Swiss-Prot record:
Task of the protein: Produces ATP from ADP in the presence of a proton gradient across the membrane.
Cellular localisation: Cell inner membrane
Subunit structure: F-type ATPases have 2 components, CF(1) - the catalytic core - and CF(0) - the membrane proton channel. CF(1) has five subunits: alpha(3), beta(3), gamma(1), delta(1), epsilon(1). CF(0) has three main subunits: a, b and c.
Keywords assigned by UniProt, alphabetized: ATP synthesis, Cell inner membrane, Cell membrane, CF(1), Hydrogen ion transport, Ion transport, Membrane, Transport
The protein, known as: ATP synthase epsilon chain 2
Annotated Pfam families: ATP-synt_DE_N
Entry keyword annotation includes Nuclease: no
Family: Belongs to the ATPase epsilon chain family.
Membrane topology, as annotated: Peripheral membrane protein
UniProt-listed InterPro entries: ATP_synth_F1_dsu/esu, ATP_synth_F1_dsu/esu_N, ATPsynth_dsu/esu_N
Length: 136
């Protein structure tokens, strides 16, 4: 499989730079897989998981929104905030979700509530994707 260059950058640091086979992105209009030879594209990103695949190696990163551009055989991901899944604080995320849930009950109907619900849903999806599976 042909590889391509990927850079994942946040305001804090360069989190990833390397040759990969595939990248899966959380686009605001749905998840998107990018392979070498993909048509040029610019995508707004929602909070979620970015997965890079190079052979048998998968790296996962949590992002809290951003922008991705694929052109001239390179993918650049500009994340609002990002961290490696390995270094992500799941307890802190759960606390943020609990705070969001409490504040949702106090908000009135309108655009602000719609944005808050969308953010809440994205954070819950991240938590679900990262939390260890539990038996019922």
């Amino acid at each position: 499989m042909t590889r391509f260059q990927v850079s994942l950058v946040s305001p804090e640091s360069l989190l990833f730079s390397g040759q990969v086979d595939q990248v899966d992105l959380p686009g605001i209009e749905g998840d998107l897989g990018v392979l070498a030879g993909h048509a040029p594209i610019v995508v707004m990103l929602r909070p979620g998981i970015v997965t890079t695949v190079a052979g048998d190696i998968r790296d996962r990163f949590v992002i809290l929104g951003g922008l991705a551009e694929f052109s001239q055989g390179e993918l650049t991901i500009l994340a609002d905030s990002a961290s490696s899944v390995d270094g992500f604080d799941l307890t802190r995320l759960k606390a943020q979700i609990d705070e969001m849930q409490e504040s949702l009950a106090k908000q009135s109907v309108g655009d602000e509530l719609d944005r808050a619900v969308a953010k809440f849903d994205h954070f819950k999806a991240i938590h679900t994707a990262l939390a260890p599976a539990t038996a019922f």
